[in-house]
Amino acid sequence: MAHQEYFVVVYNNGTKFWFQNGKLHRLDGPAVEYANGDKLWYQNNKRHRLDGPAIEYADGGKHWYIDGVKLSIDILMALS
């Protein structure tokens, strides 16, 4: 795999955003990590994750997205 270069914005409270070519994007982890523990995966500015939920809230809530499209529980159950 080619080396990935990111522009990372880190706020004083610890919140972090990863960008590539001006878009939220990260291949090796969440592109957004909020100080409260929430994590959001993005590729090319779209919520996207194939190996788990694209949104993981610190309180345990989770949402699955592929290429920016939210997957319903029915689709998730059919895929498992």
Describe the residue ranges of each PLM region.
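Glycine/tyrosine- and acidic-biased, solvent-exposed loop/turn segments at the edges of beta-strands
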Residues: 1-80
